[in-house]
Amino acid sequence: MSGPSHVPVLLDRVVALLAPPLEREGSVLVDATLGLGGHTEAVLTRFDLARVVGIDRDPEALALAGRRLAPFGDRFTGVHAVYDELPDVLARLGLDAVDAVLFDLGVSSMQLDVRERGFAYAEDAPLDMRMDGSTGPTAADVLNTYAAADLARILREYGEERFARKIAAAVVRERAKEPFTRSGRLVELLYAEIPAPARRTGGHPAKRTFQALRMEVNDELAVLRRAIPAAIDAIGVGGRVVVESYHSLEDRLVKQAFVAASRLDVPEDLPFVPAGHEPALRLVTRGAEKAGPEEIALNPRAASVRLRAIERTSKGAAA
């Protein structure tokens, strides 16, 4: 994010989806990907009776959001954690259930804008890419230690990179001469290995590789796989989980979790649903919602967003 004036993707639609549970007195939203707090600010401004627990693994984002949201006083609580730690966070805060959980996945514009974090490929910077810069392996560690087959798998699965094997082989060859430490050298390698015709389509040639490395460094899919069921379990009756994803693998994972949670627990050919077998959750969005052309023109990042929401209708356990 370039600053507090940044408007999150699909903000109005997200707030509308959150409105039914958050209009209740004493309602609590967990903003599981706080960032600079754009969603939280909108919620606290719109819903006078709501409180927000904001989770972020990035200490810098948490500090900036805390300053931005200070005018709301004790209606906002910031927590340094990864969002799959949601059950522990709620237990520490003494919350048995919440009214809504929001995820806005992927790297924030703020992280892209800080050169030293190494998320962006437009400027030469240390190959870090950790959302929490105090712990875990860096992108340089991945490039310098992973076997060629593992590098190729990451690039293919997380980056959907057609030239994954070629790039992985080049990384292994070049790191034998000198370990990778900076993004500029990796970008040069990608320009050399990706054929010119392919470089002219599909955006910057480094985009897919940098995305794949970021997802690997931060274990994003595994974290999300644990977090979505935890969020569904955390909401009370009438509560909603809302997710914005920007990668096909993320959206597929969210879709599968939502469909499984809202599935009928009876044979498909049964002509009626017996009492007690109704699904405890329902899909709120019809498929994945997308941004319109006007928003995409103002914010190109919105082009890849996929928005889904689910609501708990009874106390029964999720599938």
UniProtKB/Swiss-Prot annotation:
It comes from the Bacteria. One of its GO terms (cellular component) is cytoplasm. Pfam families: Methyltransf_5 (PF01795). It is an enzyme of class 2 (transferase). It catalyses: cytidine(1402) in 16S rRNA + S-adenosyl-L-methionine = N(4)-methylcytidine(1402) in 16S rRNA + S-adenosyl-L-homocysteine + H(+). One of its GO terms (biological process) is rRNA base methylation. PANTHER family: 12S RRNA N4-METHYLCYTIDINE METHYLTRANSFERASE, S-ADENOSYL-METHYLTRANSFERASE MRAW. This is Ribosomal RNA small subunit methyltransferase H. It comes from Nocardioides sp. (strain ATCC BAA-499 / JS614). The gene is rsmH.
